Amino acid sequence: SPAFQAQKQAKVNDVLDKLY
């Protein structure tokens, strides 16, 4: 679902922000 994809993308962005 779009909501799930958005949540997953937000999580990925958060992780990447911490890495870089």
Curated annotation (Swiss-Prot):
The keyword Membrane does not apply. It is found in: Secreted, Extracellular space. The keyword Transport applies. GO terms for cellular component: extracellular region. Its main location: secreted. Disulfide bonds: none annotated. One of its GO terms (molecular function) is oxygen carrier activity. Keywords: Copper, Oxygen transport, Secreted, Transport. Hemolymph. Hemocyanins are copper-containing oxygen carriers occurring freely dissolved in the hemolymph of many mollusks and arthropods. Belongs to the tyrosinase family. Hemocyanin subfamily. This is Hemocyanin subunit 6. It comes from Homarus americanus.
